[in-house]
Design a protein with these regions (language model features):
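Active-site/ligand-binding-proximal alpha/beta "capping" segment
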Residues: 192-242, 246
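Short glycine-rich anion-binding loops that position phosphate/pyrophosphate groups of nucleotides
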Residues: 33, 54-56, 83, 102-104, ...
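Glycine- and other small-residue-rich loops at beta-strand/loop junctions that grip anionic moieties
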Residues: 2, 28, 122-123, 148-149, ...
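RNA substrate-binding interface of SAM-dependent RNA methyltransferases
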Residues: 34, 41, 66, 71, ...
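Short basic, glycine-rich beta-strand/loop surfaces that mediate nucleic-acid
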Residues: 95-99, 163, 210-215
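N-terminal positively charged helical leader segments and presequences
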Residues: 1-89
Length: 268
């Protein structure tokens, strides 16, 4: 059992809470039973799993630990409660924290089915919002989520947490805006941009064909280049005083409108 806060592996985990270290070491953190379970189900390779039985909250936690330990490439280490508290990113942890290699998440690896449904996030600033978007995208059955803002860190531990691990269960890609626009054009994927000043309501857009729902920043919206690239611009109606709604809520509304339209489509 690791009991020293000065242990090299403990220090590495603490470093990985910072983006620059995640990027330089090409490793990231996964904390929590549900999140680690979904990572394992998605065949994410676990390099190390740190456990603190004192914090276990589920009767089947040890089963997951044994499942990870069965991988010859994974190291499982028990740690003291003080050490785990030092490494943990969240409050009320359930005693499991894993280190895994950062995925490439390339656009070229993303499958494009006929009439695919995608979501493009151009500037989601808050990890909690991005995690919620991923969770909604998973629930709506999207074919992929594309993140194209250099300032957005998909591997932030709070993104993983807010997504409830669904970041591992749906296809995700990261690329610069120009590459994303070329990719969408190459695959004939229509761009439906969410813009508060659009003339049309979101329910008027045809989301039954291959399309990508485009979301910008809550504060500044979509930039000129993205607006010029959009095939359709739509807004969510608002009868209150707020000039915009939370970007994750907007994503959820539009994704489930797309799902509703597709469900009503007659099958061939």
């Amino acid at each position: 059992m690791i009991t020293s806060l000065q242990n090299a592996r403990v220090k590495q985990v603490v470093r990985l809470r910072q983006r620059r270290h995640r990027e330089s070491e090409r490793l990231f953190l996964i904390e929590g039973y549900r999140e680690i379970q979904r990572a394992v189900e998605a065949s994410v390779r676990i390099h190390a799993l740190f456990t603190c039985e004192q914090f276990f909250s589920r009767s089947d936690t040890k089963d997951l630990v044994r499942q990870v330990a069965a991988d010859v490439d994974a190291t499982v280490e028990a740690v003291s409660s003080a050490v785990f508290a030092k490494m943990s990113v969240r409050d009320g942890s359930d005693g499991l924290l894993a280190v895994a290699p950062s995925p490439a998440w390339s656009l070229g690896d993303m499958t494009v089915p006929a009439n695919g449904l995608f979501l493009v996030s151009t500037a989601t600033e808050k990890p909690g919002n991005l995690g919620t978007i991923l969770r909604s995208a998973d629930a709506a059955g999207v074919d992929g989520v594309v993140v194209c803002s250099a300032g957005t860190d998909v591997l932030n531990p709070n993104v993983v947490r807010a997504s409830l691990g669904t970041v591992f269960s749906i296809p995700v890609a990261r690329a610069d805006p120009d590459s994303v626009r070329l990719w969408l054009k190459h695959h004939t994927i229509r761009i439906i941009a969410a813009a508060p000043d659009a003339d049309r309501l979101y329910i008027e857009a045809d989301m039954t064909r291959s399309c990508a729902i485009l979301l910008g920043s809550e504060h500044t919206g979509l930039d000129i280049e993205w607006m010029a690239s959009a095939d359709d611009r739509v807004r969510l109606p608002s009868v209150g005083h707020a000039d915009s709604i939370n970007v994750a809520m907007a994503a959820t509304v539009m994704l489930f409108e797309a799902r509703r339209q597709r469900r009503l489509q007659p099958s061939d």
